[in-house]
């Protein structure tokens, strides 16, 4: 099976890349490929779409760090069950209105379901053994401007690329996972309080476990 490991930056995947270079895979076994998609939705969307057209993967795993709305999540690794475009809309005097509330998009038009980009591969999510949380994708976060999160579930994970993964893989019908290690609270710009190193170590550890499990996994795991 062709496995595509997607990350926004080298930093998030470097340790796993080194491990892969020193790991021996069987001739007919897992065939992993790394792709650095770049920061943000546009770069990620282009890189992922282009790679799928060049060589369709059996599974895409997007791996990276993220922020969380709950302090207890810091240092943990989770799988993302659904994504929302948290700041795509208009800030009115009365508050933020997303594209669905504005009537610009149907909240149930595929690949959206009630305004969310769900990962339908529930068996795959369960197989990870990780807590499954909701994700929100943003273009900008300011410590004093968290209105977008007030409209979402209490326990959410923030990134700048997650929705691009979900949207493209849903449209292309490619199985996918989004794995996030929580390094900080959303809106906290004081990096002295971030647990970046710990998050990266935890992310690498879970990715290695996941790849080793995939080497012996039945491909029926990738069915909806």
Model segments located where?
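Generic non-transmembrane alpha-helical segments
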Residues: 120-130, 168, 206-213
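Regulatory input/activation interfaces that engage signals or partners
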Residues: 182-224
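Metabolite-binding pocket within alpha/beta catalytic cores that recognizes anionic/polar moieties
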Residues: 1-109
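Short loop/turn motifs at secondary-structure junctions
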Residues: 56, 73, 131, 173-175
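A C-terminal functional module that forms or caps the active site or interfaces directly
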Residues: 137-187, 191
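Hydrophobic/aromatic beta-strand patches that form the interior of the parallel beta-sheet core
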Residues: 35, 61, 78, 131-136, ...
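Mid-sequence, gly/pro-rich, charge-dense loop/helix-turn segments that line enzyme active sites
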Residues: 69-157
């Amino acid at each position: 099976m062709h496995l595509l490991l997607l990350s926004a930056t080298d930093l998030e995947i470097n340790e796993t890349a080194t491990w892969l270079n020193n790991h021996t895979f069987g001739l007919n076994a897992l065939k992993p490929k790394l792709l650095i998609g770049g920061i943000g939705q546009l770069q990620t969307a282009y890189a992922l779409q282009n790679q799928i057209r060049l060589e369709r993967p059996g599974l895409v795993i997007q791996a990276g760090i993220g922020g969380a709305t709950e302090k207890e999540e810091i240092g943990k690794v989770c799988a993302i069950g659904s994504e929302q475009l948290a700041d795509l809309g208009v800030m009115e005097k009365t508050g933020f209105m997303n594209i669905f509330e504005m009537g610009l998009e149907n909240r149930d038009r595929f690949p959206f379901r009630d305004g969310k980009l769900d990962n339908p591969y529930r068996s795959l999510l369960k197989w990870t053994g990780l807590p499954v949380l909701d994700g929100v994708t943003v273009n900008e976060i300011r410590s004093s401007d968290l209105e977008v999160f007030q409209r979402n579930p209490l326990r959410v994970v923030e990134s700048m690329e997650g929705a691009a993964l979900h949207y493209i893989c849903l449209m292309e019908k490619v199985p996918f996972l989004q794995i996030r290690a929580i390094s900080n609270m959303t809106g906290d710009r004081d990096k002295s309080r971030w647990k970046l190193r710990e998050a990266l170590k935890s992310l690498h550890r879970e990715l290695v476990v996941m790849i080793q499990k995939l080497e012996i996994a039945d491909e029926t795991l990738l069915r909806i």
